[in-house]
UniProtKB/Swiss-Prot annotation:
GO terms for molecular function: acetylcholine receptor inhibitor activity; ion channel regulator activity; toxin activity. It is found in: Secreted. This is Short neurotoxin 7. The keyword Acetylation does not apply. Binds with high affinity to muscle nicotinic acetylcholine receptor (nAChR) and hinders acetylcholine binding to the receptor, thereby impairing neuromuscular transmission. Competes with the binding of alpha-bungarotoxin on muscle AChR (from Torpedo) (IC(50)=0.30 uM). In vivo, causes muscle paralysis, spasms and increased respiration. Belongs to the three-finger toxin family. Short-chain subfamily. Type III alpha-neurotoxin sub-subfamily. The lineage of its organism: Eukaryota, Metazoa, Chordata, Craniata, Vertebrata. Residues 1-21 form the signal peptide.
Amino acid sequence: MKTLLLTLVMVTIMCLDLGYTLTCYKRYFDTVVCKPQETICYRYIIPATHGNAITYRGCSTSCPSGIRLVCCSTDLCNK
């Protein structure tokens, strides 16, 4: 009986959805796993006068404000 109970507990633990975490790009090739409360990936581009724009990427709890901003909510959507 104890073996059956232990087996059922193990199967239950393995089948539980322990939570979904979003994955976003932090740099062009580097990714980061977001915190559970961070449900948005963003990409923010700051144009430069000399031609090299600066791009920031990451996770957020809300869509930050800014020019040339992209917000999305699926894995690796902010490339």
